Amino acid sequence: MQEIIASVDHIKFDLEIAVEQQLGAQPLPFPGMDKSGAAVCEFFLKAACGKGGMCPFRHISGEKTVVCKHWLRGLCKKGDQCEFLHEYDMTKMPECYFYSKFGECSNKECPFLHIDPESKIKDCPWYDRGFCKHGPLCRHRHTRRVICVNYLVGFCPEGPSCKFMHPRFELPMGTTEQPPLPQQTQPPAKQSNNPPLQRSSSLIQLTSQNSSPNQQRTPQVIGVMQSQNSSAGNRGPRPLEQVTCYKCGEKGHYANRCTKGHLAFLSGQ
């Protein structure tokens, strides 16, 4: 009734103008001070604040949805530049690690969110379409719903507000459900013709040479076998005739088996 008889909406007091223009606001003595209890800077929202880090009001950029866990302990050094919220809001706290990992939290006064794991499970798109091959072992939620008869016929007057289910007939294509490309189905032998032909011809020659019992092996095969035997022989320990003791300088034994002592090399000079 007072607003109808004596409205003051057209009157603007000097105090309101001073608050909007931040008149009398003194800059901070040094940057990095805690401004969690201060108001939001109106000029920063309009990109017109020239005080920078010395501004006594908060500079909020974007929508911050999670509370800063370092700010809760008084250890956040970013100040207004922090990408998390510097405000104690229980609805915007981070998720509790122990409750999400083990399903329980022993802290009765835990400040973090305890989110029900069932709420994180999404609906199965295959089951909503009509059939899911994974059955009860599916990692997604299988919710039984009653299909709208009007929607199956072709039109439902209720639209999105219908209490029955409007099924989706498009197939959900995942990374594992996609059919292979035609290039991947081709065998690798068709891509390069020359190397397999040369390899097959060499195998035919070797089998034809080894098929006759009276025919001797070719020098190439013998050379390959000798090189294999020599490489196999080099893998073993060397004979003692080729071993030289670095203590006494004589051959025939290792340095750890030398009986002349560590000053034996002086006797040879």
UniProtKB/Swiss-Prot annotation:
Q: Which lineage is the organism of this entry classified under, starting from the top rank?
A: Eukaryota, Metazoa, Chordata, Craniata, Vertebrata
Cited PANTHER family: CLEAVAGE AND POLYADENYLATION SPECIFICITY FACTOR SUBUNIT 4, CLEAVAGE AND POLYADENYLATION SPECIFICITY FACTOR SUBUNIT 4-RELATED
Q: Which InterPro entries match?
A: CPSF4/Yth1 (IPR045348), Znf-CCCH_3 (IPR041686), Znf_CCCH (IPR000571), Znf_CCCH_sf (IPR036855), Znf_CCHC (IPR001878), Znf_CCHC_sf (IPR036875)
Protein's UniProt name: Cleavage and polyadenylation specificity factor subunit 4
Keywords assigned by UniProt, alphabetized: Host-virus interaction, Metal-binding, mRNA processing, Nucleus, Phosphoprotein, Repeat, RNA-binding, Zinc, Zinc-finger
Ranges for region Disordered: 173-199
Q: Name one GO molecular function term.
A: RNA binding
Q: Gene Ontology cellular component?
A: intracellular membrane-bounded organelle; mRNA cleavage and polyadenylation specificity factor complex; nucleoplasm
Gene from which this protein is expressed: CPSF4
Q: Which domain of life is it from?
A: Eukaryota
Where are residues bearing Phosphoserine located in the sequence?
Answer: S200, S202, S212, S267
